[in-house]
Amino acid sequence: MKKMPVLFVGHGSPMNVLEEENPFNQNFRRITQNFPKPKAILMISAHWYSSRLQVTSGEQPEMIYDFYGFPEDLSQVQYPAPGSPELAEQVRSLLQPENIELNPTRGFDHGAWAVLKFLYPNADIPVVQLSLNRLQPAQWHFNLAKKLATLREQGVLIIGSGNIVHNLRAISWEHINQIGAGYDWAYAFRDHINQAMTTQNNDELVHYEQFGENAALSVPTPDHYLPLLYVMALREPDEKVAFFNDHLIAGSLSMTSVLVG
């Protein structure tokens, strides 16, 4: 079996789900036409940011509507993909000696279903989510991700879902739907990170704070940035990156997405 690629997706606002024909969602649909259908998906979402390492192990995870102040239609969205207790157990085994908890009741958060709905709209591929341990530094996450590499050879698509630039306090709501609306500091940080990915400078990706104020404004908390490190950690030395949805919206949100492999 050909090794599966790895994918980072900028998920942006939950409202994207209700705008089925927006260009970001159209590109999500297109990108999965470039490689074989996976046997299963391992999702690392910014929206499962916990004090311990966990993995979903239920057979039919429920939907989690982890947002407030949005239209009721958004809380009616369904993505009834099955879980995979077998993959969950395999992930737990691969990540040893880290203590990882199987969570049979945790469902899919919007960092997962809001993009999977367009990547694989039939919801017929088993999905497992891995949490982000908020108590650990970036280097720990990068090193942990490397332990998942063998899954790529077994037909598992590993997806990181977050945003390289994600500052909700700085959002310009009047530009929420305007592609190309970004603050100077957001563009500068996005460009630094894109260049580090292009040249495979993993040290700069892990130690992103070296980019000073641009980094502090773009990544005020690491939750939305960390999923990118899981994807980049799984990149082989000879693998190229392909950018898509590489735009800023609302001043301080980047939709930049990257296919590896």
Describe the function of each predicted region.
Residues L74-P82, P104, S131-A138, A215:
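Flexible, glycine/proline-enriched loop segments at strand-loop-helix junctions
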Residues K2-E98:
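A short aromatic-anchored loop/beta-hairpin motif
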Residues S93, P97, I125-P126, R134-Q136, ...:
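Surface-exposed, charge/polar-rich loops and edge strands
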